[in-house]
């Protein structure tokens, strides 16, 4: 039986500033899927602490590399958002069917900053009128729309969202903060402080994380009464050269693969969260189960990934129809464009091998000295 996993990862990069189409085609032709590549890559870069892997299979540790090192999560952090939405929906605090105006979401949309995620979502739901709240959440997870994410942050409340990790037994997860608004920090500093580009870069580089988050929150608050104009959005993105993108990427909320495997276990066992929560959460998180081929051999499975120009992350869980349970988290940072492309192309096959091939799991344990 052919077994399929569709790896849908959300991009948080500005692709037009990272690589040209011709270069991408070159890499597409050159780098084919190779699950062994991920193993060799992790072994090569493990000492740098820029790569982290944690895998459990039927409660057995298959691999653990830098599992307590905090790394930027990119869009994988949206799992926390989905959990808070499901909890509020289960408690009757949110109505999944309530109508949300597309125009209210668009104020948070910054063109060319999410790899086309938001536009892809809009192509499905339309660009005018309204959609049910559950579809906004679906757009955040299935398409990885940052605009949907920031809209939901304001709706659900950041205090409630940031209480989720602790409620799941994860005390050191860094706080979430508005993604789109943080992209406006450089242009806002330049205007309000009358900084040059160089002065702005220096100011953000030395800024403490608490202050950085405060700027993002303040910008987000302003947008509630005065959304950014299209011209302001163009000016903000024009400033986001690769050096600004790197600072932004490094300052995204961080956590560990050990943290996220713990969360994946909670989502996988279907016992720790109230069943009413799962009624709202599973249709959002388990996009993989929309594929009929996956339903033939998987009981349930979910995942969320993310990337920037420098980061690639994924967290997933699965239980197959024989009752085998797998939880996996892989986080990486400071990637070259070539390494990121090779990892991305190999990740789906790597996950499939972990889920279905005992010999590959033994190979993983041997390479990472898990006895």
Describe the predicted segments one by one:
Residues 91-100, 139-144, 179-183, 192-195, ...:
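Noncatalytic linker/hinge segments flanking ATPase motor cores
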Residues 16-21:
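Hydrophobic core of alpha-helical transmembrane segments in multi-pass integral membrane proteins
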Residues 53-61, 103-109, 140, 214-222, ...:
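Short low-complexity stretches enriched in small and charged residues
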Residues 4-15, 27-42, 62, 222-371:
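Structured C-terminal helix/loop/strand segments within mature extracytoplasmic catalytic/sensor domains
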Residues 89-95, 130-144, 187-205, 209-223, ...:
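Hydrophobic transmembrane alpha-helix bundles
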Residues 50, 143-259, 263:
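Mid-domain, small-residue-enriched loop/turn segments at the edges of structured enzyme/sensor domains
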Residues 26-80, 84-190:
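Active-site-adjacent loops and short helices of periplasmic peptidoglycan-processing enzymes
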């Amino acid at each position: 039986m052919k077994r399929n996993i569709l790896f849908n990862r959300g991009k948080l990069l500005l692709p037009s500033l990272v690589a040209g189409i011709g270069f991408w085609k070159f890499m597409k032709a050159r780098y084919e899927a190779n699950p062994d590549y991920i193993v060799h890559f992790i072994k090569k870069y493990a000492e740098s602490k820029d790569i982290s892997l944690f895998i459990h299979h039927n409660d057995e540790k298959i691999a653990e590399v830098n599992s307590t090192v905090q790394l930027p999560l990119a869009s994988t952090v949206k799992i926390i958002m989905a959990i808070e939405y499901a909890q509020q929906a289960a408690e009757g605090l949110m109505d999944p069917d309530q109508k949300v105006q597309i125009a209210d979401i668009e104020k948070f949309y910054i063109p060319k900053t999410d790899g086309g995620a938001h536009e892809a979502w809009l192509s499905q739901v339309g660009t005018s009128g309204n959609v049910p709240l559950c579809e906004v959440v679906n757009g955040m997870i299935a398409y990885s729309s940052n605009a949907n994410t920031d809209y939901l942050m304001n709706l659900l409340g950041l205090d409630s969202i940031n209480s989720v990790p602790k409620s799941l037994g994860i005390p050191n997860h860094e706080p979430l903060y508005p993604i789109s608004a943080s992209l406006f920090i450089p242009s806002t500093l330049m205007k309000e402080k009358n900084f040059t580009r160089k002065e702005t870069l220096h100011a953000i580089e030395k800024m403490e994380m608490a202050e950085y988050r405060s700027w993002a929150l303040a910008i987000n608050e302003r947008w509630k009464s005065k959304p950014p104009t299209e011209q302001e959005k163009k000016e903000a993105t024009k400033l986001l050269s690769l050096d600004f993108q790197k600072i932004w990427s490094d300052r995204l909320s961080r956590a560990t693969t050990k943290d996220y495997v713990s969360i994946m276990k909670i989502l996988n066992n279907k016992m720790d969260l109230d069943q009413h929560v799962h009624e709202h959460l599973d249709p959002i998180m388990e996009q993989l189960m929309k594929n009929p081929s996956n339903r033939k051999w998987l009981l349930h499975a979910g995942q969320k990934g993310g990337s920037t120009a420098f980061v690639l992350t994924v967290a997933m869980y699965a239980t197959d129809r024989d009752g085998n349970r797998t939880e996996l988290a892989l986080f990486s940072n400071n990637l070259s464009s070539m390494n990121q492309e090779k990892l991305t192309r190999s990740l789906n096959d790597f996950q499939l091998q972990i889920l279905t091939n005992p010999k590959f799991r033994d190979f993983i344990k041997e390479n990472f000295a898990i006895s």
